[in-house]
């Protein structure tokens, strides 16, 4: 499992995640890159779940982004439709957190595409810890999105045994 967190504040969206890969109760790798830029670096995405499954979904999602000229909501919906309707794809176990300069979404294997009302996304085993920390920091500090993501991931990593302190953090800016 893992922790992926996305925070959108002012004119910036940031997605960060840890790098731990586990097999059962064993840490197999501590520096997996679970955050990627896609579609000419106009979309950032992170995954929670099986690594091989997530990379398969990243490839499919990148093809959908190209097919729909980078329209994030449309590409996400089309990926979710395929994921839900294809027998082989339904067996993939992963969640995607994706964002462009305007929109943040969660894509699930159940065919759900969810846009959080507060532009805060947290997925994975440490997601609820990171989300709680991020909400508290957003409401009670003047930290920027990068700082909130890093501090929240640190809090999650201190609590969740499936989350480590090896973070990858990426950001996008909007004209807003």
From Swiss-Prot:
Q: Which domain of life is it from?
A: Bacteria
Q: Which organism is it from?
A: Buchnera aphidicola subsp. Schizaphis graminum (strain Sg)
Q: Which reaction does it catalyse?
A: ATP-dependent cleavage of peptide bonds with broad specificity
Question: Which PROSITE patterns does this one have?
Answer: PROTEASOME_BETA_2
Biological process (GO), any one: proteolysis involved in protein catabolic process
As for subcellular location, the record says: Cytoplasm
Q: Where does Na(+) bind?
A: 157, 160, 163
Q: So what does this one do?
A: Protease subunit of a proteasome-like degradation complex believed to be a general protein degrading machinery.
CC per GO annotation: HslUV protease complex; proteasome core complex
One Pfam short name: Proteasome
Encoding gene per record = hslV
Give the multimer and partner information: A double ring-shaped homohexamer of HslV is capped on each side by a ring-shaped HslU homohexamer. The assembly of the HslU/HslV complex is dependent on binding of ATP.
Q: InterPro entries from the xrefs?
A: ATP-dep_Prtase_HsIV_su, Ntn_hydrolases_N, Proteasome_sua/b, Proteasome_suB-type
User: Keywords in UniProt for this one?
Assistant: Allosteric enzyme, Cytoplasm, Hydrolase, Metal-binding, Protease, Sodium, Threonine protease
EC number assigned by the record:
3.4.25.2
- Thylakoid: present as a keyword of the record? no
Q: Name one GO molecular function term.
A: metal ion binding
* Protein name per Swiss-Prot or TrEMBL: ATP-dependent protease subunit HslV
């Amino acid at each position: 499992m893992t922790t992926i967190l996305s925070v959108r504040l002012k004119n910036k969206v940031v997605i960060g995640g840890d790098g731990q890969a586990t097999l059962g109760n064993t840490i197999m790798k501590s520096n997996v890159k679970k955050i990627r830029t896609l579609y000419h670096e106009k979309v950032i995405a992170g995954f929670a779940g099986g690594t091989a499954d997530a990379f398969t979904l990243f490839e499919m999602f990148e093809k959908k982004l190209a097919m729909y000229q980078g329209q994030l909501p449309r590409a996400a919906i089309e990926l979710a439709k395929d994921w839900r309707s294809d027998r082989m794809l339904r067996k993939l176990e992963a969640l995607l957190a994706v964002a462009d300069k305007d929109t943040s979404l969660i894509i699930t294997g159940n065919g759900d595409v969810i846009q959080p009302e507060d532009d805060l996304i947290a997925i994975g085993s440490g997601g609820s810890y990171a989300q709680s920390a991020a909400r508290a920091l957003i409401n009670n500090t003047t930290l920027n999105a990068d700082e909130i993501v890093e501090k929240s991931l640190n809090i999650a990593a201190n609590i969740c045994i499936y989350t480590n302190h090896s973070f990858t953090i990426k950001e996008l800016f909007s004209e807003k």
